[in-house]
């Protein structure tokens, strides 16, 4: 079966790991905090590298960016230097990741107006995340996210939106039980949805350690196959070609690991595996009861059902 092929190449820069939301499953949880002025100057320098001309899309990711992270005037000034530089460059698309669990008026609105004034709003993709459990630890947080999504739709319709959802066991349960309709959610949010496999990240040693903290975070293989049959084969609410493709992710990312910038140079190659600087961190993905990858299971099911 053919995988989804991205029409362009995408370079992404992590600014920092700082974020107040405190998701227990976050792959950046409790990472070493980096000096934000150093990080922003590092990215300004990287944007001068000739390598950027290999890519026609660019992205910025935290941590979080627009909650309290750029409160300090010097940090904010440097952040806007980065944005100004990006806006002046050759990039056809600009990805900006944010959790949307904060007061938009503090920083995000100013940033969106800045991007509008630069005339790049049609290039910008606001990337956020939704999860059935552990992300919204209070009802207030969920309401804030939903309110901000509605506000983006009404006040900033010229900015496209994108949502990532982790294929956790909990999420799959809500879908299989009929408590969450993927197609309706996408329509309600007016946003493209992509699904990513759960990972133990840079904080936990392995899947079992994270599963003990967030029960049902990693799905069983059997449960995932039921989800595939229902949502990919029968309802076609999920594009299986994207599930088995690394090309929905950035091609190259400057990622923080143990307080250091690490270049993940070709994340779209088949079989790409994140390797942590801390040898105890396995960065495991997939199922709690199998070492098979989500990709392998998707392909095997498609072959068995002769699905194109």
List the predicted regions and their residue ranges.
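Core AdoMet radical
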Residues: 30-38, 54-75, 88-105, 119-147, ...
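Radical SAM enzyme [4Fe-4S]-AdoMet core and its adjacent flexible, acidic
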Residues: 120-269
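Canonical Radical SAM [4Fe-4S] cluster-binding loop centered on the CxxxCxxC motif
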Residues: 1-42
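Short, intrinsically disordered, charge-biased short linear motifs at domain edges
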Residues: 6-14, 240-252, 281-291
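Flexible mid-to-C-terminal extensions adjoining Fe-S/redox cofactors in radical SAM and related proteins
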Residues: 250-308
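Distinct, well-ordered alpha-helical segments
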Residues: 71-81, 104-116, 139-141, 174-182
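Leucine-rich repeat
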Residues: 45-52, 81-87, 114-118, 184-185
């Amino acid at each position: 079966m053919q995988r989804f092929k991205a029409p362009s190449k995408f370079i992404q820069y992590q600014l920092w790991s700082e974020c107040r939301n405190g998701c227990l499953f976050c792959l950046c949880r409790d990472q070493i905090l980096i000096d934000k002025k150093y990080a922003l100057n590092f990215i300004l320098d990287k944007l001068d590298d000739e390598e950027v001309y290999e890519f026609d899309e660019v992205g910025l990711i935290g941590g979080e960016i627009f909650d309290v992270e750029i409160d300090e005037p010097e940090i904010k000034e440097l952040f806007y230097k980065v944005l100004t530089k990006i806006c002046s460059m050759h990039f056809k698309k600009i990805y900006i990741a944010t959790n949307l669990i904060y007061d938009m008026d503090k920083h995000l609105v100013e940033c969106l107006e800045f991007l509008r004034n630069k005339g790049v709003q049609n290039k910008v993709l606001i990337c956020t995340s939704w999860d059935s459990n552990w992300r919204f630890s209070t009802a207030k947080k969920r309401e804030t996210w939903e309110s901000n999504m509605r506000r983006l739709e009404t006040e900033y319709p010229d900015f496209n939106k994108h949502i990532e959802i982790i294929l956790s066991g909990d999420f799959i349960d809500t879908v299989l039980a009929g408590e969450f309709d993927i197609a309706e959610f996408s329509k309600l949010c007016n946003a493209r949805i992509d699904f990513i496999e759960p990972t133990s990240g840079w904080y936990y040693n392995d899947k079992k350690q994270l599963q003990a903290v967030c029960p049902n975070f990693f799905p069983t293989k059997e449960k995932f196959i039921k989800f595939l049959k229902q949502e990919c084969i029968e309802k076609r609410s999920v594009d299986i070609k994207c599930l088995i493709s690394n090309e929905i992710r950035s091609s190259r990312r400057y990622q923080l690991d143990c307080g250091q910038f690490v270049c993940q140079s070709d994340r779209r190659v088949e079989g790409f595996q994140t390797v942590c600087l801390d040898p105890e961190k396995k960065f495991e993905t997939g199922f709690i009861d199998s070492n098979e990858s989500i990709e392998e299971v998707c392909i095997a099911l498609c072959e068995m059902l002769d699905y194109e």
